[in-house]
Amino acid sequence: MIYLISGKQNIRLKSQMKNIVKKSLGEIDAINFVKHDASYTLVQEIVDEANYLPLGYDHKAVIVDNPYFLLKEKSKNKIESDQNYQELIDYINHPDESCDLIFLVNTSDSDIDKKSEIYQAIEANGQVIALTEPKENEWIKCSRPWSLNIIAWKKKPSAMPAWPRRRR
């Protein structure tokens, strides 16, 4: 399945991506979970990775972070002249059933070029998920698990994660 997840909050993007991956994979391993940064990776390499069979698993996920080619304002990129977008469009139109290809766009939905061939192929053959900003009452729901952890840490400091603490 092909997914395009867009939103301004990186935490919510990653959470949505993890939910999709957990549903399809169950267990995340370095072999069945591959992540590429599109600003440094050719789309041909991403398509090749998506076409490889998952070793020892029934399913795998390929994550494409920062797909600048989906934005209205495309950034200047050194690898742009070597990109073969038609290969990506062909893959999106005929995806491998044993692979989930997930595009993570860390921007609002209005910044995505919805007229591009790649976006239209994703929309026709996959799922587009636009994460909106939470409203006032939703912020409370989003932050509640985090705030409960803070309360637990105050009661029992040994439960705090082992990040560097300030020395006195």
Predicted regions and their residues:
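Conserved beta/loop motifs at nucleotide-recognition and modification sites
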Residues: 1-168
